[in-house]
Amino acid sequence: MVKMLVLYYSAYGYMEQMAKAAAEGAREGGAEVTLKRVPELVPEEVAKASHYKIDQEAPIATPGELADYDAIIIGTATRYGMMASQMKNFLDQTGGLWAKGALINKVGSVMVSTATQHGGAELALISTQWQMQHHGMIIVPLSYAYREQMGNDVVRGGAPYGMTTTADGDGSRQPSAQELDGARFQGRRVAEITAKLHG
C-alpha cells in the first residue's frame, strides 16, 4: 500500500480544509495517508491577535520523516506569490535528506491558497515544485484531467500545476465545494499514480 504524507501550512484554516480533502481523496485512491502540518513561526500572541486558527488537530511534522513516505502532497498558503515562510523554513531543513538522495523518485504534488484570484497561486505552485525537483521527486500535477477547473462563470480553483483556493482574509469566502472536490481529485490522482510507480 502506498504511504502518503499530506503536509500543510494554514494560518486561518483554509488550507487545512484543502489538506483534509486531499487526504480523503488519497484514501479513496488506496493510499495509507498521514496528515501533518509544519510549525508556526509567528509568535503566539501575534497569531492570537491576528485570529490565526491555532487549534488545528494535525500533529507537527519533522523534516526527517519525509523519507518515510512514497508520496508527499504539500499544501501551503501563498505570501506575495511564494509559499508561506513557515513551509519554506521547513523545507530549508531538508538538506540532509537531499545530501543522501532520500527523496529521489518519491512522488510530489502541491496545492496553494491565496487571498485574491490573482494572488500568485501559479507562481507559488511552480516554485514549491522546484523544491521537490531539487530532491529528485516525480511531480504529479492536478492537470486538466480535473475538468471542473474550467469556466469563468464563478470563481473556480485549480491550475494545471495543482489545486488552488481563493479564500478571503476576513473569512467571508471559504474553500468552495468545487475547490474541495479538486483537492480530493488531486489526492486520489497522486495515490493512483504513486501506486503504479511504487506498487
UniProtKB/Swiss-Prot annotation:
Q: Which domain of life is it from?
A: Bacteria
Binding of substrate, residues: W98
Q: Which SUPFAM superfamilies match?
A: Flavoproteins
Q: What is its EC number?
A: 1.6.5.2
User: A cellular component term (GO) from this record?
Assistant: membrane
Could you tell me which Gene3D superfamilies the record lists for this protein? 3.40.50.360
Q: Give the PROSITE patterns listed for this entry.
A: FLAVODOXIN_LIKE
What is a GO molecular function of this protein?
NAD binding
* Reactions performed catalytically: a quinone + NADH + H(+) = a quinol + NAD(+); a quinone + NADPH + H(+) = a quinol + NADP(+)
Which cofactors, by name?
FMN
Stretches with biased composition (Polar residues): 163-177
Q: Which keywords annotate this record?
A: Flavoprotein, FMN, NAD, NADP, Nucleotide-binding, Oxidoreductase
Q: What class of enzyme is it?
A: oxidoreductase
Q: Which residues form the signal peptide?
A: none
Could you tell me which residues belong to the region Disordered?
Answer: 158-181
Annotated residues for binding of FMN: 10-15, 78-80, 113-119, 134
Which segments constitute the Flavodoxin-like domain? Answer: 4-190
Cofactor remark from the record: Binds 1 FMN per monomer.
Q: Which residues bind NAD(+)?
A: Y12
Q: Which family does it belong to?
A: Belongs to the WrbA family.
Q: What is this protein called?
A: NAD(P)H dehydrogenase (quinone)
> Which organism is this entry from?
Brucella melitensis biotype 1 (strain ATCC 23456 / CCUG 17765 / NCTC 10094 / 16M)
Q: What is the lineage of its organism?
A: Bacteria, Pseudomonadati, Pseudomonadota, Alphaproteobacteria, Hyphomicrobiales
